[in-house]
């Protein structure tokens, strides 16, 4: 992994956290920091995340000239989701530099524009659509490799969660509002009508929620804020309830597991390729919508979700240990570093 370059973000977003963690794990020789103020909902920039690393800052989308300066002298470079300039892959190839992209299927432009310059390697961050991507682009051009997480980042949250007592306290992440109620918030709110168990449910969002998300239930508390330390989101809970309606990389699931929280999700890919069967909720296809291609939408079986919540209330602390073991074996730096070193 000599002379690696990495394109990074520093906003409070999934991409910001993902590229920050990859930087700390891979220790690239050079960074290209994308100041996303002009196009991201998250305006705060955290350039200090990358103190001690060499590189360049670009406001918005890099020009061909800026890419050539960034790539000069590198052996390979990696980016997440997008290169911010598709000429990056052509320029890298001209300079005999290997390129790779951690690609999310729903935002993969190559599904509708196969003529665009492609990286030498697609890295899939979840199992969702992995086989289809291999069929489209070749077995040797696509690999599954999830984003790394340092267990120490969530150590404090994990210790608090392991020690907490009393009535169960569950977390639901709305995050940044996405199309078609992606995280299944409305399904969860409907399921609450069918469970009388005693627990607290914290619904967290990064922005103000529509009226339909605001319901009167003594068990619900709303939290609408950004936090500087992602791990604080997962502190002092017993589980994450996230009945997602459509698939893709879900960093909150991975982060929750590292915090010692079991995660309740719909029984669809990639959830059912990661989580134990008993943590999954029956669901059915309820529609489709278009991103770069048609994406299936799933709705939870509401009464099954309510029963799963009742089941969760009765679980002892062993389920938290199981959650952390699952997170560590799949996402820890020590497990993933050799795999990244072998391909970059």
Language model: regions and residue ranges:
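Short alpha-helical donor nucleotide-sugar binding micro-motif in glycosyltransferases
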Residues: 71, 232-237
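Conserved catalytic-core segment of nucleotide-activated headgroup transferases in glycan assembly
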Residues: 151, 163-216, 227
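Extended catalytic core of nucleotide-activated donor transferases of GT-like folds
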Residues: 42-133
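A charged, aromatic-enriched C-terminal amphipathic alpha-helix characteristic of glycosyltransferases
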Residues: 14, 159-160, 297-304, 313-344
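Short hydrophobic beta-strand element within catalytic cores of glycosyltransferases
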Residues: 262-265, 272-275
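Donor nucleotide-sugar binding/catalytic pocket of nucleotide-sugar-dependent glycosyltransferases
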Residues: 120-134, 138-156
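Acidic anion/phosphate-binding donor-loop and adjacent secondary structure
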Residues: 111-113, 148-167
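Aromatic "clamp/platform" in nucleotide-sugar-dependent glycosyltransferases that forms part
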Residues: 245
């Amino acid at each position: 992994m000599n002379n690696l370059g990495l394109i990074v973000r520093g906003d409070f977003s999934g991409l910001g956290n993902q590229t920050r963690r990859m930087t700390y794990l891979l220790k690239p020789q050079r960074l290209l920091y994308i100041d996303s103020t002009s196009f991201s909902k998250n305006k705060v920039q955290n350039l200090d995340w990358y103190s001690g690393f060499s590189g360049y800052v670009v406001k918005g989308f890099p020009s061909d000239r800026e890419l050539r300066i960034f790539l000069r002298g590198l052996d390979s470079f990696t980016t997440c989701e997008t290169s911010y300039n598709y000429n990056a892959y052509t320029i890298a190839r001209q300079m005999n530099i290997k390129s790779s992209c951690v690609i999310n299927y729903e935002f993969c432009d190559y599904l509708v524009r196969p003529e665009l310059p492609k990286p030498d390697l697609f890295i899939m961050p979840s199992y969702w659509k992995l086989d289809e991507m291999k069929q489209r682009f070749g077995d040797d051009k696509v690999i599954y490799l999830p984003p790394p997480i340092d267990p120490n980042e969530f150590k404090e949250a994990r210790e608090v969660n392991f020690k907490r007592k009393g009535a169960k306290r569950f977390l639901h992440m709305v995050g940044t509002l996405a199309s078609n109620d992606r995280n299944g918030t409305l399904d969860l709110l409907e399921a609450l009508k069918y469970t009388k168990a005693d627990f607290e449910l914290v619904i967290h969002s990064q922005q103000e929620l529509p009226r339909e998300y605001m319901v009167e239930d003594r068990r619900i508390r709303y939290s609408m804020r950004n936090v500087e330390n992602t791990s604080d989101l997962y502190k002092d809970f017993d589980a994450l309830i996230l009945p997602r309606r459509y698939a893709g990389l879900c960093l909150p699931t991975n982060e929750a597991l590292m915090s010692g929280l079991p995660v309740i999700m719909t029984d669809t890919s990639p959830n059912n390729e990661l989580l134990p069967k008993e943590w999954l909720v029956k669901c059915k296809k309820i529609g489709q919508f278009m991103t770069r291609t048609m994406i299936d939408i799933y709705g939870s079986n509401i009464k099954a979700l309510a029963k799963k919540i009742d089941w969760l209330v009765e679980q002892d602390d062993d389920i938290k240990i199981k959650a952390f073991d699952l997170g560590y074996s799949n996402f820890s730096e020590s497990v993933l570093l050799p795999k990244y070193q072998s391909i970059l």
